[in-house]
Amino acid sequence: MTMTDPLGDMLTRIRNGAARRKASVVTPASKLRARVLDVLQAEGYIRGYSEIDHGNGKAEITIELKYYEGASVIREIGRVSKPGRRVYVSVKSIPQVANGLGITILSTPKGVMADHQAREQNVGGEVLCSVF
């Protein structure tokens, strides 16, 4: 069966894994998912991730979730731009999450990046998700 929203599926797996206090979660691999995970790792929301290629054209990503004093570092994670309704913003209208305590991840012409990087590089794009 085909997946309508692969990025949304990955975010749901992370949310569910964190709710169940899992050490790691597994998701099918893609370039977009890996770029979003790069941002999450750089911002300190996950410990890391590793790609596993099974050789039959199906690769998986194992995401190591991060906890602080028994609670997940990720309190909320959600998709903003969805396949049925894309959300694009200019650099002036990039949303802040929790008054700057969280991040918004954007897909820009310069690559996938966090909101503060997009503001520094003066570039807008598609709002993929928000994390707090």
Swiss-Prot record:
GO BP: any one term: translation
Its biological purpose: One of the primary rRNA binding proteins, it binds directly to 16S rRNA central domain where it helps coordinate assembly of the platform of the 30S subunit.
Oligomer status and interactors: Part of the 30S ribosomal subunit. Contacts proteins S5 and S12.
GO molecular function: rRNA binding; structural constituent of ribosome
UniProt KW keywords: Ribonucleoprotein, Ribosomal protein, RNA-binding, rRNA-binding
InterPro entries: Ribosomal_uS8, Ribosomal_uS8_CS, Ribosomal_uS8_sf
Keyword Ribonucleoprotein belongs to the record: yes
Domain of life: Bacteria
Transmembrane segments: none
Protein name, per record: Small ribosomal subunit protein uS8
GO CC term, one of those recorded: ribosome
Family per similarity comment: Belongs to the universal ribosomal protein uS8 family.
